Curated annotation (Swiss-Prot):
Record InterPro entries: Ankyrin_rpt, Ankyrin_rpt-contain_sf
Domain of life: Bacteria
Record keyword Repeat present: yes
A Pfam family matched in the record: Ank_2
Keywords recorded for this protein, A-Z: ANK repeat, Repeat
Keyword Ribosomal protein: no
ANK repeats: 59-88, 98-127, 131-160
Species annotation: Rickettsia bellii (strain RML369-C)
Signal peptide (from-to): none
Designated name of the protein: Putative ankyrin repeat protein RBE_1411
Amino acid sequence: MRVQMFSGKETGEFIGGKTSLQTEAYENGLKDEELYYNIKDDLGLISRGNVYLDKTAQTIFSELSIAIDKGNLEPLKNFLKNNKLQHKKADINAKNGYGDTPLCYAAEKNNFEVAKILIKYGADLTIHNAKGETPIELFSQYGNREAVNYLQHCLDILGNNSLYEDTI
């Protein structure tokens, strides 16, 4: 099921680097904070599982990126939990228009709490962004030792840590 707005555009469509939801809000003169507060109720519907989004990269990423940008973990947790419980196939490793997965995006924002949630729900730690950087490399650039150690531990468990020997 795809969610459509009044304009007929689908929420996951990308137009000029923004989702159609963001584009429509900006066309109507809304700023970032206003956009967030105007759609937070919609995010609540999505996170409660009343609205099911299709699995396009743009849709999953746009919903996750709002939670990442605002640091509000509850909509993100609820979205991922309901996606898993409802056996939906939204791709947690989908890339946005800039080549970032949600985990890479969280690492670029140095948001370790969001990264832990994404990893819990199956985010792949080995996927590179468009610049060829992995989440562990991105956290390392910020000097976020706690995040780097956590990701290394996860990679050790998965048996993939040899990919990251020279990142710190």
